[in-house]
């Protein structure tokens, strides 16, 4: 079915919908991963975005039950050069087109993804529309320009849970706190409150592997509630949108950083930066993919990392921290640790899913920091 992709600057490409009729809009970005499309689709950090995969053939291994990073598809639309309809994978439960159609998400193929990626790299990520409903290119460009920009958008409210839950190893399970806010921690490990701003499930798996006893909470959970729960440390997850909009969350994080160990990944890294007095800015086209080189300044090692962010903490803006990681492509901040308090964070994704596992030591580093701070 004939479909068009129109960007706000008037750049228009024609392709074919592989999920039926429809129209969708959002910020158009590109991802340089060769594999891992299922994890991309189910990553809540992609809310509000239409993702172009730079690799030319996507869908070869279908969709599996084991490779989800959340319970649904979060991208606004999926843009590929060619979509495979006959996957070859013994684990596959359905094809990529069927999966997107099941979740009501538009997919477009036949697009010159090299031309689109080059355009976005030169001109920056921008708003766009994909539609099968009209071939009026000027009208589609007008619709793209009417969409909200990513700056100023709080998208966490679209993907975060409303109530606390526990992680059973495969899926979230609801929990009930006592009237006074206390939580009956089921395990014997360090008691960790995990803020879910749009968390990827592999983060929960790896925190569990480190021996933490987890209570996962919504963004509205206050520092006072954290204390009442009996938590000993706090972890801030990834998530979508502009971190500068989350002023209430930053206020509560600031309180928690004065009381207990705190770590963050991606959006959590940005929120910690704000809580400690720093600022953030929007990157031209973001970092999206699983082949980004990062240098760990603590060890001197070079890591290939998985990344997905459109905003970045200004590298000189956060007081009283040691810069621990930098991006070797553009020199942007990839991680910091506080000089006197048990606080650390990274911008990239050490849990990967998809991507390399070079940075997975971050979870052990956090576990060691908590052990030193709380004595177990």
UniProtKB/Swiss-Prot annotation:
Biological or metabolic pathway of the protein: Amino-acid biosynthesis; L-arginine biosynthesis; carbamoyl phosphate from bicarbonate: step 1/1; Pyrimidine metabolism; UMP biosynthesis via de novo pathway; (S)-dihydroorotate from bicarbonate: step 1/3
Keyword annotations of the record: Amino-acid biosynthesis, Arginine biosynthesis, ATP-binding, Glutamine amidotransferase, Ligase, Nucleotide-binding, Pyrimidine biosynthesis
Broad enzyme group: ligase
Q: Return the annotated region ranges for CPSase.
A: 1-187
Give the Enzyme Commission number.
6.3.5.5
| Active site: residue positions | 266 (nucleophile), 349, 351
Q: What InterPro entries has UniProt attached to this entry? A: Anth_synth/Amidotransfase, CarbamoylP_synth_ssu, CarbamoylP_synth_ssu_N, CarbP_synth_ssu_N_sf, Class_I_gatase-like, CPSase_GATase1, GATASE
Ranges of residues in domain Glutamine amidotransferase type-1: 191-376
A single Gene Ontology MF term assigned here is: glutaminase activity
The chain's coiled-coil residues are none
Biological-process GO terms, alphabetical: 'de novo' pyrimidine nucleobase biosynthetic process; 'de novo' UMP biosynthetic process; glutamine metabolic process; L-arginine biosynthetic process
Q: Which residues bind L-glutamine?
A: 45, 239, 241, 267, 270, 308, 310-311
The cross-references to CDD domains, in alphabetical order and at most eight, read: GATase1_CPSase (cd01744)
Which PANTHER family does the UniProt record give? Answer: CARBAMOYL-PHOSPHATE SYNTHASE SMALL CHAIN, MULTIFUNCTIONAL TRYPTOPHAN BIOSYNTHESIS PROTEIN-RELATED
NCBIfam families for this protein: CPSaseIIsmall, PRK12838.1
Q: Subunit composition?
A: Composed of two chains; the small (or glutamine) chain promotes the hydrolysis of glutamine to ammonia, which is used by the large (or ammonia) chain to synthesize carbamoyl phosphate. Tetramer of heterodimers (alpha,beta)4.
Q: Which HAMAP family match?
A: CPSase_S_chain
Can you tell me which family this protein belongs to? Belongs to the CarA family.
Say what the protein does. Answer: Small subunit of the glutamine-dependent carbamoyl phosphate synthetase (CPSase). CPSase catalyzes the formation of carbamoyl phosphate from the ammonia moiety of glutamine, carbonate, and phosphate donated by ATP, constituting the first step of 2 biosynthetic pathways, one leading to arginine and/or urea and the other to pyrimidine nucleotides. The small subunit (glutamine amidotransferase) binds and cleaves glutamine to supply the large subunit with the substrate ammonia.
What is this protein's record name? Answer: Carbamoyl phosphate synthase small chain
Please name the source species: Nitratidesulfovibrio vulgaris (strain DSM 19637 / Miyazaki F)
């Amino acid at each position: 079915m004939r479909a068009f992709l129109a960007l706000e600057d008037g750049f228009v490409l024609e392709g074919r919908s592989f999920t039926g009729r429809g129209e969708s809009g959002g910020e158009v970005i590109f991802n340089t991963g060769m594999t891992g499309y299922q994890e991309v689709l189910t990553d809540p950090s992609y809310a509000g975005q239409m993702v172009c995969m730079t690799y030319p053939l996507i869908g070869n291994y279908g969709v599996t039950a084991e490779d989800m990073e959340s319970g649904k598809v979060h991208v606004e639309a999926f843009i590929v050069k060619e979509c495979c309809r006959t996957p070859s994978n013994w684990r596959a439960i359905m094809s990529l087109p069927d999966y997107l159609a099941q979740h009501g998400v538009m997919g477009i193929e036949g697009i010159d993804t090299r031309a689109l990626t080059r355009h976005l790299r030169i001109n920056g990520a921008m708003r766009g529309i994909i539609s099968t409903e009209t071939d009026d290119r000027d009208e589609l460009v007008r619709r793209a320009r009417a969409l909200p920009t990513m700056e100023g958008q709080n998208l966490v409210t679209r993907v975060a849970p409303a109530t606390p839950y526990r992680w059973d190893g495969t899926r979230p399970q609801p929990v009930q706190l006592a009237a006074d806010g206390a939580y009956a921690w089921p395990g014997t490990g360090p008691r960790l409150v995990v803020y879910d701003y749009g968390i990827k499930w592999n983060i929960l798996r790896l925190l569990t592997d480190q021996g933490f006893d987890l209570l996962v909470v919504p963004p509205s959970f206050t520092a006072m509630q954290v204390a009442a729960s009996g938590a000993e440390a706090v972890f801030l997850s990834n998530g979508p949108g502009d971190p500068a909009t989350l002023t209430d969350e930053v206020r509560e994080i600031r309180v928690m950083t004065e009381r207990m160990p705190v770590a963050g990944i991606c959006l959590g890294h940005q929120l910690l930066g704000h809580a400690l007095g720093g600022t953030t800015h929007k990157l031209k086209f973001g970092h999206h993919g699983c082949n980004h080189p990062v240098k760990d300044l603590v060890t001197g090692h070079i890591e290939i990392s998985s990344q997905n962010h459109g905003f970045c903490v200004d590298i000189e803006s956060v007081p009283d921290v040691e810069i621990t990681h930098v991006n070797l492509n553009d020199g942007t901040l990839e991680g910091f640790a506080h000089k006197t308090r048990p606080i650390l964070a990274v911008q990239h994704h050490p849990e990967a899913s998809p991507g390399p596992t070079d940075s997975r030591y971050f979870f052990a580093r956090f576990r060691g920091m908590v052990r030193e701070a709380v004595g177990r």
